[in-house]
Amino acid sequence: MMCGFTSNPSPKKLLSKSSATNVHLEISPVKPDRPCKGYENVLGSCTTVAKCADLTDDLPVHNKENLLHGFNDLERHHDEENSSLQDSGYSSILQNDSPCQDETDSNVSDIQVRDTPKNLMQYQKPFHTLSTRCLPILRFEAAMCSTLKKMRKTSKKIDWNAVDDVVCGGNYGLEHLIGKSMGLERVDILAELFHRDFKHLLTKILRHLNAMDLINVIGVSTTWRKILQKDNWAYNTYKLGCKELCEKRAKVSTHTATRDESLCRVPLASVQKVAASSLCTSKKQNKNGGLSNNRHAEFIEVAQTLKNDQSLKACVDCGSPAKYDSYLHRAICTRESCKLDFCTLCSCKYHSSKSCLISKPRSYRIPIEPLPGSKKSKQNLRRL
């Protein structure tokens, strides 16, 4: 990387260059020296150069008399410097006892002072401009630092109540910070948009939902209900969806006796309950009649396949016809899904040779004394 700093050339080098240019000018004109491209980028806003850096700025290039006059001035300046200076380069800058220091210090100071990074920072704009001061986090940071400094002067301990007062009291606008909800497992995006008054975004989101989705949305929370009620289009579609759903459910189920089944209630709900109860009872009666007819037909079909020692009995579990053996007190259900083999005395599973608890003979209590009025009591009286 090339440095943009240019030191004052020595008078000997200037004379050699001037003589070379004089010889060259007699043959053809000389092109003016141009600075390198990266020189302006390095210096930035500082564009000052030494006074004797370029002779072609004030004088025309093709005027030989002016050029010769300029070179004569350089020779005089060279004679004055030779009396006090023996070397060239940076030593002329570092020497403090030379009489021509006052003239060179002005040029050198212009280059040195403005090229240092500290002085370059002075010409740059400060970081905390008006736009950055309006940022909420910087305002909050400044307030917290000032309070903590004051607390540090009085006591070493931190008073968290004072910190809470600063946080709650100042209107810093921290609720508008981006990324404050990062790290949370669940974030209510619709509620955040509603609190920040982004109505145009909420309307775009609600336009992508159908009637059933809006019915589910309104039951999530009160904030979502408010969002839906404030949007006219979404609320109207929600109402139409509710009506269509009620009509569909009314077609499927003719009665709406319970509140769970009915989505929206009608003012004459008590009259509907009375009508629904009568319909339910009539339906139950019809169902029972139909079941009895079917069961009778089943018994007739099974009776045709019975043997001489068999009869029919109803199954204990399902009520279907079961083939009964009166000698073994055993019955087997004819239904394929049941096939229960049970004892007709105890209604339990068939226990073959084991004695049934209910079929045991009853132990009658024999009275010790005869009953009054009986034959034995009369005989006893005669004996006496």
Curated annotation (Swiss-Prot):
It comes from the Eukaryota. A zinc finger (ZBR-type) spans 311-359. Zn(2+) 1 binds at C315, C318, C333, C338. InterPro entries: F-box-like_dom_sf (IPR036047), F-box_dom (IPR001810), FBX5_43 (IPR047147), ZF_ZBR (IPR044064). One of its GO terms (cellular component) is spindle. Pathway: Protein modification; protein ubiquitination. Residues 83-99 have a biased composition (Polar residues). One of its GO terms (molecular function) is ubiquitin ligase inhibitor activity. Residues 1-20, 79-106 are annotated as: Disordered. Residues 191-238 form the F-box domain. It is found in: Nucleus; Cytoplasm; Cytoplasm, Cytoskeleton, Spindle; Cytoplasm, Cytoskeleton, Microtubule organizing center, Centrosome. Keywords: Cell cycle, Cell division, Cytoplasm, Cytoskeleton, Metal-binding, Mitosis, Nucleus, Ubl conjugation pathway, Zinc, Zinc-finger. Zn(2+) 2 binds at C343, C346, H351, C356. Regulates progression through early mitosis by inhibiting the anaphase promoting complex/cyclosome (APC). Binds to the APC activators cdc20 to prevent APC activation. Can also bind directly to the APC to inhibit substrate-binding. Required to arrest unfertilized eggs at metaphase of meiosis II, by preventing their release from metaphase of meiosis II, through inhibition of APC-dependent cyclin B destruction leading to stabilization of cyclin B-cdk1 complex activity. This is F-box only protein 5-B. It comes from Xenopus laevis (African clawed frog).
